[in-house]
Every structure is written in C-alpha cells, then in structure tokens.
Amino acid sequence: NSYYGYYFMINLRPHQAQIVDILKHHSKGQVIVPTGGGKTMCMIKDAQREFNSCSWDVILKDPDRKTIVIVAPRILLAQQLCEDFTKHLEAHHMLQYKVLHVHSGETHYESTTKVNTICDWVKDNYRFNKLIFTTYHSLRRIQQAEIDVDTIYFDEAHNSVQKNFVEATEYFSMYANRCYFFTATPKHSKTPFKIGMNDYDIYGRVLVNVPAPKLVQEGHILPPKVNIRKIDVVDDSRFKHEHDCDHVVSTIDEIDIDKVLICARSTKQIVNLVSQTDFCIELRSRGYSWMYITAKTGAVVDGKKVDRECFFNTLNEWGKDDTKKFV
C-alpha cells in the first residue's frame, strides 16, 4: 500500500545484502568494504528500512520521524552522496522526506551552517523523515544544535580520527541511536594518546570486513594494475607545462583507454596544463572531451564553467556512455 511509505527498487549484491542485514541487528560498528564495493548502496538500503519502520497509524499518533545524518570528508562527496540517496529514495504521497545540507558548499537544497537554523529546520519538519548531509569539518555544527539523531553514517570513516573531528565523532557515537563507520582503509592508533578506529568505545567492533579478493573473484571490482613509465626530468621550469602535456598525451596514446583520470599535484598544475599548453587541442584531435573540478576554480567541462550539479550529471552521463571518450 503506497500510503505506508516509500517504494524502493534496489538490487543488492550478496555482500551488500549481508551488510544491510548486519546493520539491522547492531546499533554501532565498523563496516570495512573495498573501494568500489558499494558502501553507499548499503547506507541507502538501511535508510530506506529506517524510513519505513513506522506504520501510518503510529505516525498519526506520533508524527516524529527519523533523522539520518550522512558525513563525508569533502563538500563534493557530500553533494554526490545526496544525489545518490535522493535518486534511489522515491517518496510516495504524504511520507516525503526533507533534505538539509550543513556545509559551506553550493546546493539547490536548503543549506546552512548556523546552529539555530539547524534547530529550526528540524522543528519545522518534525512530520517528515529527514536527511542531513554534512562534512567532518561541519559536523560539530550539528553537535552544537543538539538535535536527536536516529542514525548517522560516517563515509570514509578513517578521516574521523583527525584531531579536529574526534570530539564530534565521539559525541554522535554516544548519543545517536545508531552509528556506523564505513571505510576501505581503517586507521588504527598504536598509542593511547591518539584516537584510532581500534578505540572500540567510540567506533564499536568491526561488524563486517569484506575481502577485496572475494569481490574481484565475483567480478564486482577490478584488481589494480600498475604500469610505471620513466620520464626525463626537466630542470627549466619554463618548459615544465609542455613536458607535462607531452608526457600525459603520450601515455594516453599508449594505453588507448576511452576514459582517463589524471591526478595532479595541485590546482595550479591542472590550470597550467589546460591553459598554457596544447593539451586540450591534442585531446580534441583524438576525440576526447575533458573536464576538471577543484575547490579553487570550480567545475569546467570542455572549457565551459558549470556548476557542480551539472559537472556530476555530465560525469555520470559520460561514464555510462560506452562510446564517449573523456579525460
């Protein structure tokens, strides 16, 4: 009956179904999943179950709904998580959910870093399920708001052990009804003077640890393959950008891959590559589009400045297109 909540069509892989079932029976703990193993879908499926946990009769008597917080290490990832959640959570009739972002980034959803505004938003939307997306830097704002949190997911949870984030992490570990730490690379501490994810009072025990070889064997992720290229060092900084261009273009020609990710040392290196060399011309001559995004420059697609939402929509569209070549 559609009046009783949401309708979700999420097909889980076996290890994801195992994780979701484990979360059902534990209120706190660590979920160790290799990169590409689908941690986000586990969060979404668990959130679906939480949103559907009350029947309509109960809601009429007690309209307080679930509040779920999702923590990401960076604003861009918080926005991407929001897109993933909202894409899969389809509301039906009166049981709609509301979305709030607590960080300084741009979003077309309601957004704030003010404690009083967070409190007011929660009170104003008490009849709705609530999703709050934030970063580790801004999590303390939600802590200061002292709102009731039913479930909190820490994405890339190894970031939470940083000195500036420990207080808020410990707070929600203690006061949230359900608290889960998702990561592919748990960070432990060998000294009692520094917090690590082996502090089980804060992080709980490891609920599930999915081995990477298992996912490789089942075809869910690809094993890493490393090819090392030797390049000549250029002492004259005047030619460094051209050297970067020649190196990257020749590598693209050699590997002959349609979709390429380039990791640069800095924003300056990216800007110099696309503006001070023939890199973009070389890409176009080979049938490649190009895009980049940094905190300093914002998002650019084929030389045109776009907003973050357009950037990620384009990235998803190109990524799904087997015929599209892009860097």
Where is each model-derived feature located?
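Conserved pre-motif I regulatory segment
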Residues: 8-32
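Conserved helicase ATPase core of P-loop NTP-dependent helicases/translocases
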Residues: 114-122, 291-327
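Conserved interdomain linker/interface between the two RecA-like ATPase lobes of SF2 helicase motors
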Residues: 205-266
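Walker A/P-loop
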Residues: 26-46
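Conserved RecA-like ASCE ATPase "motif II neighborhood" in helicase/translocase motors
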Residues: 131-151, 160-167
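Conserved helix-turn-beta segment of the N-terminal RecA-like "Helicase ATP-binding" lobe
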Residues: 77-111
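Conserved strand-helix element at the start of the C-terminal RecA-like helicase core
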Residues: 67-78, 251-279
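Post-DEXD/H (motif II) to motif III coupling segment of the RecA-like Helicase ATP-binding lobe
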Residues: 162-221
